[in-house]
């Protein structure tokens, strides 16, 4: 039963007593009501919303339970004690229960905040370990069990009568118990939490700096990679164009000792070649004057897959003119060689690509082609004509890439590749066709013996071996060498980029999770700051008063009113935590709104 006494310790003025009573009658019941309402919302939100059922939120539920016990079991007795004029009329048992609940719930709140701080430290400082072991409900239950076990152990001496009640005053009057409990249940956990949150925010700051640095490096890396990959793409495209163009040009210069260059219908620069070749058309015999013999197609393993050769013997009176035409043709081919190798190839692909030209078409290169041209011209100028009739050939060579047809009907050079020591005998064996590994076909309508044929082949192999490496490379192989060299340089420039990159979904999920962890850390830091603001004055005054009483038990160190106000400031913290969650956490805010609206917003 409330006594209604107007005497308040520390207040002597009647006016102040009246104001105190009015404020206490309005304010004191409001604090526990808000605490019960808010913490029940927190518990229901985590219970109802699956996305809130995390380890951190389970610890928050434990904190809400301790605040709920403070509101129900501690604040209610505090309101009664104040309304009864600070006289305890419920007996010593309830006084001990009241004091034990006060100490246990306050200690549980502090230890729950410490457990949350440890959870935040592991989540921010060691995210991989947290993802593997920390984000489990079992660990949260172990932490909660330890928190409440320690809290009950700290409050157990009060139930055993360590703090006896005197003169109807239910207060914590044992100074030694007050000092020990304050140090171990508040100050040590507070120091640990401050250290942990300092490390956490330092890690967050370092992570933000590293993220900014990665973004800056990523922009530069993207520019470099775009340039390199773009260059590789351009090189591949130019390589295709170069292959098509080289197939046509090398077809012209490959017949330097056996026939005129062909007039390619698929040439990209026909206007350049045609005027040079047309000057020799006057020496060609008419198509209808001589019979032709069709030789079956010859499969070729290189840049020319098949050839169709048509023989047309030339009249004897044209032999001299054909020889002179061939001599002039070497100058034309040499000019074409200079034009398309040094000008176009070097300009398009750089000097590095010239190293690959020895592998193009199996047996020709820029330098060696020129040497062969000069050597052939010298040989043709000093060698007399044999009594072998020249012939005309019509060669149809499908292109490898675009399968365009290239046809020509120029007269053939009557001189095949010869070794200086070869001796020729005239035997009636016409139509012998020799095929080399390159695109040059050696064809004579004369007479060769077996030794001459073998020597010719051996000399060709020997000359080819000087031009080629150990293996025969087609144009595709040479371009593959260039591509491998290019991508090796790219791999050196982009070392470290070949690590497997996570999918966009995983990156997005990880980014979202990190933002959520950051927001949760900020929210809990605010909770810790508010907790320290509410409870630190009480424990400082409480510890100071206990030390003072230990030194001098008869002195009145700190008055009743400051301790009473500091106690209710600590109780106020239990009703502020749900407000903090509502302001700083969108998920809790949505959950509160769904509960208060009976799920109306969630259904919509």
Swiss-Prot record:
Disulphide-bridged cysteine pairs: 95-170
What are the boundaries of the region Disordered? 399-430
The protein's matches in InterPro entries, at most eight in alphabetical order, are given as:
GPCR_Rhodpsn (IPR000276), GPCR_Rhodpsn_7TM (IPR017452)
Q: Among the entry's GO cellular component annotations, what is one?
A: synapse
Give the record's keywords alphabetically. Answer: Cell membrane, Disulfide bond, G-protein coupled receptor, Membrane, Receptor, Transducer, Transmembrane, Transmembrane helix
Keyword check for Transmembrane, yes or no. Answer: yes
Q: Which PANTHER family match?
A: ADRENERGIC RECEPTOR-RELATED G-PROTEIN COUPLED RECEPTOR (PTHR24248), DOPAMINE D2-LIKE RECEPTOR (PTHR24248:SF125)
Q: What does this protein do?
A: Receptor for dopamine. The activity of this receptor is mediated by G proteins which activate adenylyl cyclase. In terms of antagonist responses, would be classed with the D2-like dopamine receptor group. Mediates the effect of dopamine on the inhibition of locomotion. Acts as an antagonist of dop-1.
Family classification = Belongs to the G-protein coupled receptor 1 family.
Instruction: Name the chain's protein.
Output: Dopamine receptor 3
Organism expressing this protein natively: Caenorhabditis briggsae
């Amino acid at each position: 039963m409330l006594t209604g006494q107007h005497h308040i310790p520390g207040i002597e003025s009647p006016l102040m007593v009246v104001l105190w009573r009015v404020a206490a009658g309005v304010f004191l019941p409001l604090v526990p009501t808000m605490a019960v309402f808010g913490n029940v919302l927190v518990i229901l939100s985590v219970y109802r919303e699956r996305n809130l059922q995390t380890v951190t939120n389970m610890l928050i539920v434990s904190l809400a339970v301790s605040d709920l016990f403070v509101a129900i079991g501690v604040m209610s007795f505090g309101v009664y004690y104040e309304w009864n004029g600070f006289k305890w009329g419920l007996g010593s048992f309830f006084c001990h229960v009241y004091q034990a609940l006060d100490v246990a719930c306050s200690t549980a709140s502090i230890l729950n905040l410490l457990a949350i701080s440890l959870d935040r430290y592991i989540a921010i400082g060691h995210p991989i370990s947290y993802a593997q072991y920390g984000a489990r409900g079992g660990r949260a239950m172990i932490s909660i069990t330890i928190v409440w076990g320690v809290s009950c152990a700290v409050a157990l001496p009060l139930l055993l009568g360590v703090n006896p009640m005197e003169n109807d005053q239910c207060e914590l009057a044992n100074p030694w118990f007050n000092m020990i409990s304050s140090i171990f249940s508040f100050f040590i956990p507070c120091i640990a939490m401050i250290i942990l949150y300092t490390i956490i925010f330092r890690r967050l700051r370092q992570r933000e700096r590293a993220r900014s640095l990665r973004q800056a490096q990523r922009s530069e890396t993207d520019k470099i990679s775009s340039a390199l990959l773009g260059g590789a793409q351009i090189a591949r495209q130019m390589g295709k164009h170069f292959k098509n163009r080289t197939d046509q040009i090398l077809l012209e210069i490959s017949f330097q000792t056996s026939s005129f260059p062909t007039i390619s219908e698929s040439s990209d620069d026909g206007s350049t070649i045609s005027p040079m070749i047309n000057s020799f058309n006057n020496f060609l015999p008419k198509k209808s004057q001589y019979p032709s013999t069709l030789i079956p197609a010859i499969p070729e393993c290189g840049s020319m897959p098949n050839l169709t050769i048509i023989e047309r013997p030339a009249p004897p009176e044209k032999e001299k003119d054909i020889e002179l035409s061939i001599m002039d043709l070497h100058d034309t081919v040499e000019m074409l060689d200079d034009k398309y190798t040094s000008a176009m190839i070097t300009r398009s692909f750089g000097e590095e690509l010239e190293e690959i030209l020895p592998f193009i078409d199996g047996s020709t290169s820029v330098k060696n082609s020129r040497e062969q041209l000069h050597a052939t011209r010298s040989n043709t100028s000093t060698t007399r004509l044999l009594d072998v009739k020249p012939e005309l050939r019509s060669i149809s060579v499908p292109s490898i890439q675009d399968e365009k047809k290239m046809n020509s009907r120029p007269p053939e050079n009557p001189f095949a590749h010869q070794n200086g020591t070869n001796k020729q005998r005239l035997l009636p064996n016409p139509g012998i066709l020799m095929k080399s590994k390159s695109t040059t076909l050696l064809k004579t309508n004369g007479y060769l013996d077996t030794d001459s044929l073998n020597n010719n082949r051996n000399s060709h192999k020997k000359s080819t071996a000087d031009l080629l490496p150990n293996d025969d490379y087609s144009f595709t192989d040479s371009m593959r060498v260039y591509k491998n060299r290019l991508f090796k340089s790219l791999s050196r420039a982009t070392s470290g980029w070949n690590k497997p990159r996570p999918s966009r979904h995983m990156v997005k999920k990880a980014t979202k999770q990190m933002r959520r962890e950051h927001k949760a850390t900020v929210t809990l830091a605010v909770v810790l700051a508010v907790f320290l603001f509410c409870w630190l004055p009480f424990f400082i005054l409480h510890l100071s008063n206990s030390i003072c009483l230990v030194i001098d038990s008869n002195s009145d160190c700190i008055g009743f009113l400051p301790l009473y106000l500091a106690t209710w400031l600590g109780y106020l913290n239990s009703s502020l935590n749900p407000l903090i969650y509502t302001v700083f956490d969108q998920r809790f805010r949505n959950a509160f709104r769904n509960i208060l609206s009976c799920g109306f917003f969630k259904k919509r």
